[in-house]
Amino acid sequence: MIIYATAVQTINSFVRLESLKEVYGLIWIFVPIFSLILGIITGVLVIVWLEREISAGIQQRIGPEYAGPLGILQALADGTKLLFKENLRPSRGNPPLFSIGPSIAVISILLSYSVIPFSNHLVLADLNIGIFLWIAISSIAPIGLLMSGYGSNNKYSFLGGLRAAAQSISYEIPLTLCVLSISLLSNSLSTVDIVEAQSKYGFWGWNLWRQPIGFIIFLISSLAECERLPFDLPEAEEELIAGYQTEYSGIKFGLFYVASYLNLLISSLFVTVLYLGGWNISIPYISILELFQRDQIFGTTIGIFITLAKTYLFLFISIATRWTLPRLRMDQLLNLGWKFLLPISLGNLLLTTSFQLFSL
C-alpha cells in the first residue's frame, strides 16, 4: 500500500508539472502578441506627436507643449478624453452596422502587423504568402467604413463611405501589381525572404533602385489607401463635414482616429520592407546577420532600430505632403488611379516579368 501511495503521488506530481508547462506555454504564446500591440500603440503615439510638431514647424507656430515634456503626452490626453466621452447613436441609424464598422476598420489593420519583420526573423507570422495576406486583410477595412457610413443614416456619412470604397478599389489594384513585381524579383511572397533578397548587394540591392517606377506608384497608392492629403476625399471637411465619421463620438470616433495612424504606420513599414531593405544596414563590412549570429539580442535591437529609422524617415515625407499639395477632386482621383497608375503599374509588371524570363 505504501508503494502504491508513493506511485500515485509521483504520478500526480508529474501531472501537475505537465499542467504548469501547458500554462507557461499558453502564456508565452500571448507574450509576443502583447509586445507587438504595445509597440504599435507606442509607435502611433510617436507618429501623432511628430505630425503635430512637424505641422507646427511648417505653419510657423507652437505645437503641443503642456502635456508632458515637449507635449509628447498630448495624444494620450486626447485619447483619455475620448474614452470618457458619451457614445451617441443616430436615432434612425442602423445600430449593428454603426457599432461594428469602426471595429472592423481597426482590427483589419492590426492583423496586417503580424507579417512585418522588424528584425532578423523577428516576425509574428512568417508566412509564405505574407505579402498577399496583407493585401487581402487591408481590403477588408473599406467594408467597415462603408458599414459606418450606411449605418449612420446620414447623407454626408453615406457619401463618405462610398468615396472610401471607390478610392480603395481604385488604388488597391496598382498597389497589388507593384507588390507582384517585387515578388517576381525576390522569387517569394514572404516578407522575410523579400528583405533577405535585398541584402545580397547592400545599398544598391534595394528594390528602390531596381523598381523606381513601382516605388513611386506604391508611394502614391499607399497615401491614397491611408486617405491622406491630397487623397482625403472621404473625409473632406468642406464638402462632407467629416465623411463617414460625422455621426460618431467618444471612443468610436477615437477608433477611426487610431485606424488612420495605424494605416499610415503599416504603409510606411511595408515601404521599408519592400523597397528600403528592411532591417539591413548598408554599411560596408557590417552585416546584421553577422551581428545577430554573434549576439542575438544586440543584433535584433540594431535591426529594430534600423527598420524604425527608415519607417519614420518615410513618415516625414507623408506628413510634409499633407501641407504641400491641394486636395484632388473626385474625378481627378479616379482618373489618376484608373487611367495613369493602373496602366503604368501593369507595364512595370510586364517589364519585370520579361527581365526575369530573359535572365533565366
Curated annotation (Swiss-Prot):
EC annotation from Swiss-Prot or TrEMBL: 7.1.1.-
InterPro entries registered for this protein in UniProt: NADH_UbQ_OxRdtase_su1/FPO, NADH_UbQ_OxRdtase_su1_CS
Domain of life: Eukaryota
Sequence intervals crossing the membrane: 27-47, 98-118, 129-149, 165-185, 203-223, 248-268, 269-289, 297-317, 340-360
Gene Ontology MF annotations: NADH dehydrogenase activity; oxidoreductase activity, acting on NAD(P)H, quinone or similar compound as acceptor; quinone binding
Subcellular location as annotated: Plastid, Chloroplast thylakoid membrane
EC main group: translocase
Reactions it catalyzes: a plastoquinone + NADH + (n+1) H(+)(in) = a plastoquinol + NAD(+) + n H(+)(out); a plastoquinone + NADPH + (n+1) H(+)(in) = a plastoquinol + NADP(+) + n H(+)(out)
Family annotation (Pfam families): NADHdh
Plastid keyword on record: yes
GO biological process: aerobic respiration; photosynthesis, light reaction
Membrane topology: Multi-pass membrane protein
Keywords: Chloroplast, Membrane, NAD, NADP, Plastid, Plastoquinone, Quinone, Thylakoid, Translocase, Transmembrane, Transmembrane helix
Membrane keyword on record: yes
Gene Ontology cellular component terms for the protein in this record: chloroplast thylakoid membrane
Stated family: Belongs to the complex I subunit 1 family.
Assembly: NDH is composed of at least 16 different subunits, 5 of which are encoded in the nucleus.
Cited function: NDH shuttles electrons from NAD(P)H:plastoquinone, via FMN and iron-sulfur (Fe-S) centers, to quinones in the photosynthetic chain and possibly in a chloroplast respiratory chain. The immediate electron acceptor for the enzyme in this species is believed to be plastoquinone. Couples the redox reaction to proton translocation, and thus conserves the redox energy in a proton gradient.
HAMAP family for this protein: NDH1_NuoH
Name of the protein described by the UniProt record: NAD(P)H-quinone oxidoreductase subunit 1, chloroplastic
Organism: Barbarea verna
Gene that this polypeptide is encoded by: ndhA
